[in-house]
Amino acid sequence: GGTLAVLGDRLLDADPDYGREAGFFLYLGSRIGPAARNATAILPVAGPGEADGTFVNVEGRVQRFHQAMQPPGVARPAWMVLARLLREIDPGRAAVRDVRAAFAALASTTPEFTGLSWRGLGLKGAPLSAAAPAGSGAR
């Protein structure tokens, strides 16, 4: 099979054989559920409260969250791990050195985030762009 990458989902409801047919199964998470144990490679990422980042709430507003504690061991923010993986795949890719640059990269490549900036989110966040394609799941 092909490559399967799972980010952050503990796969608690997944079949115990989940991912076994993949040629390469990469799991990135802060907690490992039973199905994640089938992964070819596991990369630890910081969990909630262990990194700065953003989320989209149920009203479709993008909001920032801030690190409250240090992640355990060698876990790093998901944006950092993904940025390093992308640099390995494409060495010519520009380096992403902080969460603000990661958000800028997202906003420059994802229609739903067009026009948004880390600073512009402020304390109350901002709505996703009206440019979100129909059926994209963006609210």
Explain the meaning of each model-derived region:
Residues 115-139:
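Long, compositionally biased stretches
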Residues 1-119:
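Non-catalytic alpha/beta scaffold blocks inside enzyme catalytic domains
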